[in-house]
Curated annotation (Swiss-Prot):
Biological classification of the source: Eukaryota, Metazoa, Chordata, Craniata, Vertebrata
Native source organism of the sequence: Mus musculus (Mouse)
Role this protein plays: Mitochondrial 3-hydroxy-3-methylglutaryl-CoA lyase that catalyzes a cation-dependent cleavage of (S)-3-hydroxy-3-methylglutaryl-CoA into acetyl-CoA and acetoacetate, a key step in ketogenesis. Terminal step in leucine catabolism. Ketone bodies (beta-hydroxybutyrate, acetoacetate and acetone) are essential as an alternative source of energy to glucose, as lipid precursors and as regulators of metabolism.
Sequence positions bearing N6-acetyllysine: K48, K111, K137, K179, K324
Gene: Hmgcl
Binding site for a divalent metal cation: D42, H233, H235, N275
Name of this chain's protein: Hydroxymethylglutaryl-CoA lyase, mitochondrial
């Protein structure tokens, strides 16, 4: 782990004066998009070297300063399975809680939920999947058993007035089972929604999706779950994350998950590379005239910070381009 240096200011030449293009030929697009920043959890969970707790806390604070409305802070999973998240309570207690910003945490079971609530969590997330093999490797149980675990979490969350977000993994393909049926994705999404999840994030966990697959999957899911309750979570393994996200926006989705500097992967999904970079998403949305409330300059600084801490290059094309200006 490299020592953390002060982030260098970037020259946003051509970005600060960026004008929105005409979108009349692109179909209806949302006027505003809620970005769910998953870098501190999904982005860091697969790092081999343990990231110091103060670095995680500072990253989240910088993302808050950038204006991101939702920042997934950590995961209350067993350190045996994900050692990187062993400091979950310290992270959640240590971050600054900015007014108007939500800091959800992943809670796969009742034990995790109880620990999260004790640490001050106000919103939690649960993970489902459309693949039996993936669920076995990721949660050590069947799909049906995973829903039984969620049921207890959902009941406890409702009793405590804590919001629950649901994830559907492998929505566009599975590393073990290959192609995934849109109908199966719709079935799992409907079940999570009917259990009380206020929002369902549809994840292309290994990044194999294309715009056509995204359209077919969303069409099926939207027959079962209101589009206002849907989000997309795209990995960029094959360079399709922005294209897939744009299709989702054109279909009415207005919530997008992304990760600063494109950090991320999945410890149980071989070949999965990083998430859609938040910097690239914000740049595209700015160009489309879609409001996000995110300060791109401060976001780039947060990306610089964590990449220096990890001693790695950013996966964000926008960060790479502005570094050369």
């Amino acid at each position: 782990m490299a020592s953390v240096r002060k982030a260098f200011p970037r020259r946003l030449v051509g970005l600060t004066s960026l004008r929105a293009v005409s979108t009349s030929s692109m179909g209806t697009l949302p006027k505003q998009v809620k970005i769910v920043e998953v870098g501190p959890r999904d982005g860091l969970q697969n790092e081999k070297s343990i990231v110091p707790t103060p670095v995680k806390i500072r990253l989240i604070d910088m993302l808050s300063e950038a204006g991101l409305p939702v920042i997934e802070a950590t995961s209350f999973v067993s350190p045996k399975w994900v050692p990187q998240m062993a400091d979950h309570s310290d992270v959640l207690k240590g971050i600054q809680k900015f007014p108007g910003i939500n800091y959800p945490v992943l809670t796969p079971n009742m034990k995790g939920f109880e620990e999260a609530v004790a640490a001050g969590a106000k919103e939690v997330s649960v993970f489902g999947a459309v693949s039996e093999l993936f669920t076995r490797k990721n949660a050590n149980c069947s799909i049906e058993e995973s829903f039984q675990r969620f049921a207890g979490v959902m009941q406890a969350a409702q009793a405590a007035s804590i919001s629950v977000r649901g994830y559907v993994s492998c929505a566009l393909g599975c590393p073990y089972e290959g192609k995934v049926s849109p109908a199966k994705v719709a079935e799992v999404a409907k079940k999570l929604y009917s259990m009380g999840c206020y929002e369902i994030s549809l994840g292309d966990t290994i990044g194999v999706g294309t715009p056509g697959l995204m359209k077919d999957m969303l069409t099926a899911v939207m027959h079962e779950v209101p589009v206002t309750a849907l989000a997309v979570h795209c990995h960029d393994t094959y360079g399709q994350a922005l294209a897939n996200t744009l299709v989702a926006l054109q279909m009415g989705v207005s919530v997008v998950d992304s990760s600063v500097a494109g950090l991320g992967g999945c410890p149980y999904a071989k070949g999965a590379s990083g998430n859609l970079a938040t910097e690239d998403l914000v740049y595209m949305l700015n160009g489309l005239g879609i409001h996000t409330g995110v300060n791109l300059q401060k976001l780039l600084e947060a990306g610089d910070f964590i990449c220096q801490a990890l001693n790695r290059k950013t996966s964000s094309k926008v960060a790479q381009a502005t570094c050369k200006l």
